[in-house]
Amino acid sequence: PHKTFAGLLIMMALGLKLNAKPIPKPLMCLSPYMTIYGRMDDNMIDMNLAKLAVWQDIVDTPVWPGEPIGFMTHTPERVQSSMTTALHAALACSAGVTAATIASSDEAYSKGPISSQARVDTLRAVKDALRFVGNGAFLPTAECELIKEEIHSGIIDVLKTIAKRGDFVASISVIATSQSS
């Protein structure tokens, strides 16, 4: 995630130069990186909270995870899809995000047509999950802080490489090559 986050930071800096008010939208999902490196083998809380914490530490702006939350944790089964969306929404809200993008249970998995019932299923699941957590929070394991530090130092390394080379795409290629060896 550190390469993506470095790219988002660069885009935010460009947005600020254009007098925009950029809002980072980190993914709360199960991505190939997490799968390959086993970052979510134990739970989905630590990595997602670590990613949100990195943003909250390095930028003074609202954080809005999405596209949608829970991406790649959904299946075609509507109840499961609504449930994973609701769990991710509760996790995001307990971490203090400003907003989160959700998708209806049929759209979340297939990006297909959205039915009214699927939309209602997901909204009810999110409502119940938020009510369940209330003012409580999820308790990350000690691994969360280690992941956060790893992401943060990875972002710094990427930005240093980009500054040295002066070319974002070439820098990412160099970083990818050095990580695979």
What are these regions (language model features)?
Residues 1-181:
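Anaerobic metallocofactor- and corrinoid-dependent redox/one-carbon enzyme cores
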